[in-house]
Amino acid sequence: MQSLTIPKQILEDLVAEARRAAPQECCGLLAGQKMHVTRHYKITNIVATEGAEIANFDVAKISHLQRLTPVERAEIAFVMDAREMSMAFKDMRANALDLQVIYHSHPQSPSRPSLTDIRNATDFESVRKVLNLAEPVHMIISLENQAAPVLNAFRIAEGKVSQVPYNLT
């Protein structure tokens, strides 16, 4: 499996962003070409806003999320702001970049995809294919141990998860 290459500064920025957002989840996109990341797009996690769309979660999670305040929701889930995502994709097209990574943080849990993460990634597959987007890597930043954040990258296809190695430049 081909490894992902990420500039050290972008990785440091992801950790800093996750720490600033904690206890809420942060999220965003990384772009580049051929598994080489060159650009970072921080996207607002709107799940904490009143009236945020939570219908894309499974029924059990929706039931749980509905009992929480918007701020509490953002501690265990994320929904990217559609307008900001659209602007990021427009910038990618203008600069001949492809989506390489979809990232988010787990402020209090390990750096591995949750069942909701797997379901959302699997749902995104059909959209990605229609839009002719590159297959993204999913990166999770864990702050479970604040002193030593853990970042792991994964391919999620057809509900199956495989770890993707990454290198820093």
Residue positions per predicted region:
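Conserved beta-strand-loop surface patch within small alpha/beta domains used
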Residues: 1-100, 110-169
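Histidine-centered divalent metal-coordination motifs
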Residues: 104-108
